[in-house]
């Protein structure tokens, strides 16, 4: 029996509003526990929620960027459940009238493009955060009432790789809109994955398992890969899959049962009595649509068609808005687009990955990188010397021209000076000259290396090659 994998994802994104969704409590990350909450967040008797319009605007903006249809009438509902991090014993969410429906995004895996449907996008409030220790549990209600959007995909993904690509694309789009920073390490983006298997050709879905507590896109992919294998073994051996919630354990590389999965009936949804229905007219929708910036796909196409970058460069540069904006600012300061792209995709990304930092955390500026690239273009410094300048720029900042002068890094481009060095090197390496004349091309590399060593790497490489061949041919 051949089995087909069916994957759907539920992604929670914390909106970057100044206050919570139903109260005026602040939303700053990292504050002391239980210092950013109020009687409204905690559901004290007699208090009433007030809807934050900015949260609605952000939800609409995200929904439009994801090609969703925006509701004209939408409402909030109570999702009833008891848990220590939910002080009201219910969560205000949206059940049957979400703010956005029927959206899609396009992903690419192994060179093949595929459209993934988005069932719905709805607004809701976040719960608090529980921390468990050996001698008890602690609850921080700072997160209680934070505005969230939940984005539910169609079960259109067939491999864990497609799920990973979907998450990357979704995160990129949301970041470009500016409604969230989507930092998984801070909990502003969280993902639950649903996976089931069915015989190839069968229309009815198999019984699904839900994977929770997936704190990185890599864990989502690994968890799905393991669950795919687990369910396949179970089904092929004649067993059955139970509807349950599981978590991925990185230490054992397995998914572990958490609980039997609840159905939506278990939550006893009913309309939120303290909030009226929300009507969204065409004028409001158009106001939000006009505020949507250039999104990653459009920017990528522009980089290829107008800027002239290779498709791969355009893809890498537009993965994050931070990198793309940095590229644009550097080119706007007069740097060559392709040279800038090479430095960003090479040295800059390598440094950021090694140091586990973002561009905003380093001293490098678009103006600084632009000046350095221009020095390379003018021949003032070589690409090799530029790496020394770059290390200074990204660690401490400064003016590239001043760094070059202070460290004596100006490239030697005087032909007379270089010819003298070349002649001296050749006089001391006659065997290498013979080797080169006998067809051993590696000999020229050795000679160039000796010249670069003698000039402390500051010789102009193209000029060195030209003079070297001229002097060899004279002998």
UniProtKB/Swiss-Prot annotation:
Q: Which GO terms describe its molecular function?
A: asparaginyl-tRNA synthase (glutamine-hydrolyzing) activity; ATP binding; glutaminyl-tRNA synthase (glutamine-hydrolyzing) activity
Top-level taxon of origin: Bacteria
Chemical reaction(s) catalysed: L-glutamyl-tRNA(Gln) + L-glutamine + ATP + H2O = L-glutaminyl-tRNA(Gln) + L-glutamate + ADP + phosphate + H(+); L-aspartyl-tRNA(Asn) + L-glutamine + ATP + H2O = L-asparaginyl-tRNA(Asn) + L-glutamate + ADP + phosphate + 2 H(+)
Keywords for this protein: ATP-binding, Ligase, Nucleotide-binding, Protein biosynthesis
Gene3D superfamilies from the xrefs?
1.10.10.410, GatB domain, N-terminal subdomain
Q: Name one GO biological process term.
A: glutaminyl-tRNAGln biosynthesis via transamidation
EC identifiers of the protein = 6.3.5.-
Functionally, this protein is described as follows: Allows the formation of correctly charged Asn-tRNA(Asn) or Gln-tRNA(Gln) through the transamidation of misacylated Asp-tRNA(Asn) or Glu-tRNA(Gln) in organisms which lack either or both of asparaginyl-tRNA or glutaminyl-tRNA synthetases. The reaction takes place in the presence of glutamine and ATP through an activated phospho-Asp-tRNA(Asn) or phospho-Glu-tRNA(Gln).
PANTHER family linked = GLUTAMYL-TRNA GLN AMIDOTRANSFERASE SUBUNIT B MITOCHONDRIAL AND PROKARYOTIC PET112-RELATED (PTHR11659), GLUTAMYL-TRNA(GLN) AMIDOTRANSFERASE SUBUNIT B, MITOCHONDRIAL (PTHR11659:SF0)
What is the similarity comment for this entry?
A: Belongs to the GatB/GatE family. GatB subfamily.
**Quaternary structure and interacting proteins, as annotated:** Heterotrimer of A, B and C subunits.
Q: Which NCBIfam families match?
A: gatB, PRK05477.1-1, PRK05477.1-2, PRK05477.1-4
Protein name per UniProt: Aspartyl/glutamyl-tRNA(Asn/Gln) amidotransferase subunit B
What organism, scientifically named, is this protein from? Bacillus mycoides (strain KBAB4) (Bacillus weihenstephanensis)
Lineage summary:
Bacteria, Bacillati, Bacillota, Bacilli, Bacillales
